[in-house]
């Protein structure tokens, strides 16, 4: 069996990859309804193939709908959300954190180091050859001037407490009451 089966992306149009604001599209009707998804996942749970379910890259609307349906229709409950969260991307705190805490649906954090920027590897204009930022153009949202200034301040703060930037960033993420796990990986 699979301990935790996570839905990777919502099918419906929503604000992905750091896009601010939601732009509604009346023609966006070709996605599987929330209830149908939960019913499909329930079959796998009933067959013993999956123990728990979660989702990734979800919004407050999506998480709320899943929770409401699981309560009202006796369907499986989402146990986790896997979204980005770090010192420079705290959008999870707007709407999602309250739901996570009140509904006991923990955050599995990805990008706790802002795709490596909070490790300090991009300080002073550095761009390591095989880094994520060098390999994947279009990820520059973590290297904008405002973020770069924040990284310098975090570097000073970490140094003041005899820590690396990565240790500071991970300690911050781990201190949040809605976080249950964080993922880091080398790049």
Language-model features, listed with the residues they occupy:
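Glycine/proline-rich, positively charged
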Residues: 1-82
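Glycine/threonine-rich phosphate-binding loop and adjacent beta-strand/alpha-helix elements that clamp
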Residues: 168
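Conserved small/polar residues in nucleotide/adenosyl-binding loops
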Residues: 183-187
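Active-site glycine- and acidic-residue-rich loops that bind
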Residues: 86-91
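Basic phosphate/pyrophosphate-binding loop/patch that engages nucleotide-derived ligands
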Residues: 45-46, 92-106
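Glycine-rich, positively charged active-site loop/lid region within alpha/beta enzyme cores that binds
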Residues: 13-26, 101-157, 179
